[in-house]
Amino acid sequence: MPNLHPPIITTQQAKSYYSQILEVVPKEHSFKPLMTLFLTEQSDILDIAEGVKRGIVSAVKLYPAGSTTNSSNGVKDILHIYRLLEKLSHLDIPLLIHGEATDSEIDIFDREAVFIEKTLAPLRKSIPELRIVLEHITTQE
């Protein structure tokens, strides 16, 4: 998802990309892509909610800025989006997380564990009702 340039950040972009995907699916196949939006500090909760309501958007995806390929548009400070995350929780919209701390002083093999401790644990405590999927996690912590 962050490998798309530019990232899919609005419902309209997701709808367009959905159509592009279906254009290349052979007619004899039954395939329904589940579209997600790339979460930024400027994401519009009304657009997200409308996308979910219309069946276009299934979830939003959080990439910490600088955590992976093409994630520079990601969230720099999760505290800046807490209000949006609270609204996602109230609307029961899942948050998919690429859980990785981005501080260059943290060993690459410790970045998931540090993210869990410093970011995910406080988030879960602050917004316990928020549905979270921590994607491709490899740490035991």
Q: Where do the protein language model's features map onto the residues?
A:
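Metal-cofactor-binding active-site regions of metalloenzymes
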Residues: 1-47, 55-72
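Histidine/acidic residue-rich metal-binding segments in metalloenzymes
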Residues: 46-62, 68-141
